[in-house]
Amino acid sequence: MNGRYSPTRQDFKTGAKPWSILALIVAAMIFAFMAVASWQDNATTQAILSQLRSINADSASLQRDVLRAHTGTVANYRPIISRLGALRKNLEDLKQLFRQSHIVSESNAAQLLRQLEVSLNSADAAVAAFGAQNVRLQDSLASFTRALSSLPGKASTDQTLEKPTELASMMLQFLRQPSPAISFEISLELERLQKQRGLDEAPVRILAREGPIILSLLPQVKDLVNMIQTSDTAEIAEMLQRECLEVYSLKNVEERSARIFLGSASVGLCLYIITLVYRLRKKTDWLARRLDYEELIKEIGVCFEGEAATTSSAQAALRIIQRFFDADTCALALVDHDRRWAVETFGAKHPKPVWDDSVLREIVSRTKADERATVFRIISSKKIVHLPLEIPGLSILLAHKSTDKLIAVCSLGYQSYRPRPCQGEIQLLELATACLCHYIDVRRKQTQCDVLARRLEHAQRLEAVGTLAGGIAHEFNNILGSILGHAELAQNSVSRTSVTRRYIDYIISSGDRAMLIIDQILTLSRKQERMIKPFSVSELVTEIAPLLRMALPPNIELSFRFDQMQSVIEGSPLELQQVLINICKNASQAMTANGQIDIIISQAFLPVKKILAHGVMPPGDYVLLSISDNGGGIPEAVLPHIFEPFFTTRARNGGTGLGLASVHGHISAFAGYIDVSSTVGHGTRFDIYLPPSSKEPVNPDSFFGRNKAPRGNGEIVALVEPDDLLREAYEDKIAALGYEPVGFRTFNEIRDWISKGNEADLVMVDQASLPEDQSPNSVDLVLKTASIIIGGNDLKMTLSREDVTRDLYLPKPISSRTMAHAILTKIKT
């Protein structure tokens, strides 16, 4: 029994449904997909950044190309136009990307984009103006340079305008750094040239025409170049790029947080789903366990359906419980609520377990403290149940109140370690135990009803037979009275030597026998109220042992052997005493020489019903009283008729045929059975099966009357008992009976005491204290005094009238009255 999950009632009310688990799975998948999916359009963002970088590059290239075109290094304006086209395309692409991206709606990106567009438009206009004016400027410069170079003398210049003339120098200086002063000087110089004579008019006209154009266009071109060079397009593009990166970074942080949240939610939902599935699986397992438990209850009920004995049914049921809880052993004890001792014990295996009394007392005390509680403990198996082959390990012990008078204690033993079972498993064990106890109680009540029914049937039959026999017996008594009266008169009227006198004597003798038979019939027909009480068969036999001895001839030896188990039955000890006397007398009458009669008391278990000569004995537990002899035996033809009234094989020797008939009647009154087995020439055995009782046995004195125990006159009684407590108890009993007790621990101590000249009137020796080489029958020879041997319940006690002065055996426990009669008998003899 492991630690299984046991859902509570609330778990079943709030448990997840399959559709809810499916919904949670879908939600977890959605959250997981959202956690791993891309939220931002990374491709768009990267394209925006790429376009911004292209704008930066194209803007720088445009400024370079404009500068080169301004200096005249490049005469082709196609690169400038292509750069402008690229910038316009980049701007349009950027607008399209911004419309696709959510960044436009965030922060200052849209405003920066508009500023970039304005900047590009301004640059575009400046480049267009630059292109037109720079072409004209370059043409004017070329014409001006050619005209200036064609002038002779000091004013002439070469193709590179590097001739050291004043006009060329001033123009070159103006080209480098335009200023109004230089422009004014150049204008004066041009006017001077126009007024100068002797110069070629065509170059002078060209200089006069192109010079002012250069002076007016060059500052404008310079301004346009400066405007293009100082354009904020690249700066705005970089600002927009930084803004995009910042927004992108913030969005990444938010996205990462959202991803973490969604991932965590997905993982949490997955864990919750796993928990729900686990609990659902556990609840399913628990429901399956409950179904198995229902099958267990059915199987336990099946065990009690047949005619099997209660012990066999309980044993089969315990095996089912043991298998259900995966245990190695299983035992059940029904403990008396008040006396705290096991009334009945059952085990999954045979023989029955022997429970530790201290454990039972402790658990009964715990159960009585709170009658509503179930006591549950886990302790060592060796501390609970003692078996021939003990199971090492731990045992689960469960106790609860079964009835008003009984407490059920169930033990499950395990060879290996097992975790503490859950509350649900404990409840199942309690319910299974309660179910088993219920069936045992029902079977017990059925058995009691059957016993009462048999007793009632027997009583009614006896009443009917007794009424008939009583009427007949009274009529025969009257007839016999007349016959015997007249026979006695006739006897007195004839002489002693007469043959008639002898015939009359035969008539009187036969009449006396008839009177004896009629007396027995009248005894059977008397309506006496039976006293039914629980009593111990062993104690009864111990009490009547001297009476049995006196009722038998001196050539017959009696031996007794008692089992250690309880032998309590319900009925009248007087009837059982009559049964023993009748059977023992019949056995002694079947012996011609020295004979032996053995009386054995034990417990018997009948697994199946048994067919007897006089009925069918059902299975179950019984107290077995066996009486066997070594006589001549009973012939097979006679055996079926021995319990019939008036059947006898000793009609000529005074047999009435009512002795065994009364035995059968008494045993039927006990609701018992008799099984007789006999072998001619070897002896006969009477096995009397009596139903046991779980009640506390009463003292036999309550039936036989408490006679005053005989007292002594200070005689010395030596006692050998190794148990200190038991020796003190015996000494107190002996002193209370009027004797002087002298106690010894060992047999050697009393032998040394006697060897020193001390004498005792009687010696009582516990058989356990005898040396191994010392026979109990030779104790009185060693100690040279009368002795009584005290033994256990399994002591073989021999009583022989010839040997009564030599040995006497008393089985434990010994009552004060039995001890008093035994001591008095030995001292007197």
From Swiss-Prot:
Q: Where does the chain cross the membrane?
A: 19-39, 260-280
Q: Does the keyword Transmembrane apply?
A: yes
EC number of the protein: 2.7.13.3
| Main localization category | membrane
Residue positions where Phosphohistidine is found in the record: H474
Q: Which Pfam families does the annotation name?
A: DAHL, HATPase_c, HisKA
What cellular component terms from Gene Ontology apply here?
plasma membrane
Response regulatory domain boundaries: 716-827
Stored InterPro entries: DAHL, HATPase_C_sf, His_kinase_dom, HisK_dim/P_dom, HisK_dim/P_sf, Sig_transdc_His_kin-like_C, Sig_transdc_resp-reg_receiver
Q: Which residues carry this modification: 4-aspartylphosphate?
A: D766
Would I find Phosphoprotein among this entry's keywords? yes
Catalyses:
ATP + protein L-histidine = ADP + protein N-phospho-L-histidine
Record-level Gene Ontology MF annotations = ATP binding; identical protein binding; phosphorelay sensor kinase activity
What are the Histidine kinase domain coordinates in residue numbering? 471-694
How does the record say this protein sits in the membrane? Multi-pass membrane protein
Q: Where in the cell is it found?
A: Cell membrane
Q: Which UniProt keywords apply?
A: ATP-binding, Cell membrane, Crown gall tumor, Kinase, Membrane, Nucleotide-binding, Phosphoprotein, Plasmid, Transferase, Transmembrane, Transmembrane helix, Two-component regulatory system
What is the main EC category here? transferase
Task: Relate the protein's function as given in its record.
Answer: Activates VirG, by phosphorylating it, in the presence of acetosyringone or hydroxysyringone.
Entry protein name:
Wide host range VirA protein
Annotated source species: Agrobacterium tumefaciens (strain 15955)
Q: What gene is behind this protein? A: virA
